[in-house]
């Protein structure tokens, strides 16, 4: 199961279900991606305003760090579910 192609509603429904996955680790991965997306948004807003030029340097760095976390968060969410599914199957 990969969570990257699911809608928010599908992920939330799966999280609320009685299945063992997704669980907290997968939710944390998705939250990481969402936090990174917000960091990119604020960086882009800052970079688009001449009046905030003094913050451009740090905004560029924040965006550089946050962009890879968009995909990493989803990858970690999927890895967590797959790992725990393997544990459940072993019992």
Name each model-derived stretch.
Residues 17-40:
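Conserved phosphate/anionic-ligand binding catalytic regions in large, soluble enzymes, centered on
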Residues 50-91:
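A structural-propensity feature for long, helix-poor, extended segments
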Residues 1-3, 8-9, 57-58, 63-64:
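Mixed-charge, polar/low-complexity N-terminal
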Residues 3-21:
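Short, hydrophobic/aliphatic alpha-helical segments
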Residues 7, 11, 34-41, 76-79, ...:
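Amphipathic, well-ordered alpha-helical segments in soluble domains
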Residues 41-53:
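Transmembrane signal-anchor/signal-peptide helices with a preference for the extracytoplasmic
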